[in-house]
């Protein structure tokens, strides 16, 4: 049986459910697929299937993630849901599954809880741009004023972390009631689900495609072709490149070299244009083989700068995950793998009151590399020591 072809007719958007444990994230995910399956726009994925999420590896870390897909009249959605709190943190930090918008699920019976706050903070730090709130379990609260109070608290919380708390769509409903409702899409219990989908279609803008962003390609390999010059190879991370385009070579020092790409090749054939996702070789004008190396990036002029010092949110692997067995303190010097660069760095700052970082923690830290590399906010990286991954991080602020 041939695999179904992915027909790209509708715009594609990545979303996910976030929020405190047992507030109904997976039930809501199941409810969405059930409702849309009745309209022929999804396959129903029951709760127990979502809850036993398969394992994935991202940057050397094992994460349990469920991916479901569904369509509305307007769009195609890929939706992620993680069963465990630690899985969310790992997913957000590694960027295993990135989100164009998140659905924050808050139980009306509890209101915002510690993990609600933690997920919102992380979403902000990893730049999940849009947030929609689903107040769940409203059938279990008799007094509507209590639900109003929960809504106020959630809007407040979002504002504290830089989301537009006053404008965020808030939908009230019961995910369980929708899952248990009869198979008639017009049934009352599905109304909040349709409201949520409308909010997603209208409030979360269509994301800018990677190919429309400024060109960037991490350099994986360098070789010289006699009589032609120096070729650098790698996978184009974003944007597009064609012969004649000016680029900058960035990283490993503060000096930025300008050059022109004179040819773009894929499988030894010349291309008119390379785009995001392509593995290509770029022939560089007037650059010797020893003037460029793995770990640098080729980028559109002015689009990214080399930096040594930055703040990052880092998840430190537990011993059971193959990480360190002992804590570390300020002054710890592991290797940082940033795109194709492998560079030693030092932990120069930890939050106030944090003396040591234990395996299993996630913590904001300040890092200083021994030489500058191309870095920007939202950049993911791995932390390694002695050939094994001991952590994963995301840049939250560039300092110098």
Swiss-Prot record:
Residue segments, region G2: 60-64
Family: Belongs to the TRAFAC class translation factor GTPase superfamily. Classic translation factor GTPase family. EF-Tu/EF-1A subfamily.
Record-linked NCBIfam families: EF-Tu (TIGR00485), PRK00049.1 (NF000766), PRK12735.1 (NF009372), PRK12736.1 (NF009373), small_GTP (TIGR00231)
Oligomer status and interactors: Monomer.
PANTHER family on file: ELONGATION FACTOR TU, MITOCHONDRIAL, ELONGATION FACTOR TU-RELATED
Keywords linked to the UniProt accession: Cytoplasm, Elongation factor, GTP-binding, Hydrolase, Magnesium, Metal-binding, Nucleotide-binding, Protein biosynthesis
Binding-site positions, Mg(2+): 26
A GO molecular-function descriptor: translation elongation factor activity
Transport found in the keyword field: no
Binding-site residues, GTP: 19-26, 81-85, 136-139
G4 as annotated region, ranges: 136-139
GO cellular component, one term: cytosol
Annotated segments matching region G3: 81-84
InterPro entries reported for this sequence: EF-Tu_GTP-bd (IPR041709), EF-Tu_GTPase (IPR050055), EFTu-like_2 (IPR004161), EFTU_2 (IPR033720), G_TR_CS (IPR031157), P-loop_NTPase (IPR027417), Small_GTP-bd (IPR005225), T_Tr_GTP-bd_dom (IPR000795)
EC number, as in UniProt: 3.6.5.3
Top-level taxon of the source organism: Bacteria
Coiled-coil residue spans: none
Function, as annotated: GTP hydrolase that promotes the GTP-dependent binding of aminoacyl-tRNA to the A-site of ribosomes during protein biosynthesis.
Species of the source: Thermotoga petrophila (strain ATCC BAA-488 / DSM 13995 / JCM 10881 / RKU-1)
Catalysed transformations (reactions): GTP + H2O = GDP + phosphate + H(+)
Localization terms from the record: Cytoplasm
Enzyme class, UniProt record, top EC level: hydrolase
G1, as annotated region: 19-26
Identification of the protein by name: Elongation factor Tu
């Amino acid at each position: 049986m041939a695999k179904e072809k992915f027909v790209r007719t509708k715009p594609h958007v990545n979303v996910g459910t976030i929020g405190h444990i047992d507030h109904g994230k997976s039930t809501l995910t199941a409810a969405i697929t059930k409702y849309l399956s009745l309209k022929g726009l999804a396959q129903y994925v029951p709760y127990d299937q979502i809850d036993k999420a398969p394992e994935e590896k991202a940057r050397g870390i094992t994460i349990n993630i469920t991916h479901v897909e569904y369509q509305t009249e307007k769009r195609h959605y890929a939706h992620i849901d993680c069963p465990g709190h630690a899985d969310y943190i790992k997913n957000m930090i590694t960027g295993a599954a990135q989100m164009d918008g998140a659905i924050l699920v808050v139980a009306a019976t509890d209101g915002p809880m510690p993990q609600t706050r933690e997920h919102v903070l992380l979403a902000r730090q990893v730049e999940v741009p849009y947030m929609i709130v689903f107040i769940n379990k409203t059938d279990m609260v008799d007094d509507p004023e209590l639900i109003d109070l929960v809504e106020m608290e959630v809007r407040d919380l979002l504002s504290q972390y830089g989301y537009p708390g006053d404008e965020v769509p808030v939908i009230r409903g019961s995910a369980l009631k929708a899952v248990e409702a009869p198979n008639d899409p017009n049934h009352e219990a599905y109304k909040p689900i349709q409201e949520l989908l409308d909010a997603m279609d209208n409030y979360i803008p269509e994301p800018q495609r990677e190919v429309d962003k400024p060109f960037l390609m991490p350099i994986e390999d360098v070789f010289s072709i006699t009589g032609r010059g120096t070729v650098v190879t790698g996978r184009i991370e974003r944007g597009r490149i064609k012969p004649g385009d000016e680029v900058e070579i960035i990283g490993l020092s503060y000096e930025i070299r300008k050059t022109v790409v004179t040819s773009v090749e894929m499988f030894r054939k010349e291309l008119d244009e390379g785009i995001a996702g392509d593995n290509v070789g770029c022939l560089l004008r007037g650059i010797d083989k020893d003037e460029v190396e793995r770990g640098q990036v080729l980028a559109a002029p002015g689009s990214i700068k080399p930096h040594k010092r930055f703040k990052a949110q880092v998840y430190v692997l537990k011993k059971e995950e193959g990480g360190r067995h002992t804590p570390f303190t300020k002054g710890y010097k592991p290797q940082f793998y940033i795109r194709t660069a492998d560079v030693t760095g030092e932990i120069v700052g930890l939050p106030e009151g944090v003396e040591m970082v234990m395996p299993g923690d996630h913590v904001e830290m300040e890092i200083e590399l021994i030489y500058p590399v191309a870095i920007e906010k939202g950049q993911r990286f791995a932390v390694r020591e002695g050939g094994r991954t001991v952590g994963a991080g995301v840049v939250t602020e560039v300092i110098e």
